[in-house]
């Protein structure tokens, strides 16, 4: 029998509780810059998005950097237009952030090779 820890139970209940009405409130709160909405968004998606970032970077530290940069981008430029699910949009932001990170790493490694 699978037993969930209290933290996992809490996360599962938060995810189940994200109905369309709650999602709209969360989106509006993030647009308004409310810290409580930002915290809820981070709590809902950070673990899943860390896995996405890790799949692209292959490095735990880099994945954490990409995750944090992605959430900073989301919180400073909340450009969600409602054309897809919020989770899809957050994933897209993280994937784009991971690809940008990899491009910068590639440019940096080329600079180091060229200088030698």
Predicted regions and their residues:
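Sigma70-family region 2
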Residues: 31-32, 68-86, 104-106
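A short, charge-rich alpha-helical start-of-domain segment used by transcription regulators
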Residues: 27-51
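Intrinsic, short, N-terminal disordered tails of RNA polymerase sigma-factor systems
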Residues: 1-28, 40, 116
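Conserved RNAP core-binding helix
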Residues: 26, 42, 50, 60-77
């Amino acid at each position: 029998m699978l037993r969930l820890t209290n933290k996992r139970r809490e996360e599962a209940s938060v995810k189940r509780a994200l109905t369309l009405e709650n999602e709209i409130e969360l989106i509006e709160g993030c647009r308004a810059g409310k810290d409580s909405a930002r915290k809820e968004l981070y709590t809902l998606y950070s673990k899943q998005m860390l896995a996405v970032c890790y799949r692209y970077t292959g490095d735990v530290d880099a994945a954490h950097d990409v995750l944090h940069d992605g959430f900073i981008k989301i919180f400073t430029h909340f450009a969600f237009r409602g054309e897809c699910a919020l989770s899809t949009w957050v994933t897209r932001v993280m994937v784009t952030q991971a690809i940008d990170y990899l491009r910068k790493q590639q440019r940096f490694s080329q600079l180091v090779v060229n200088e030698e």
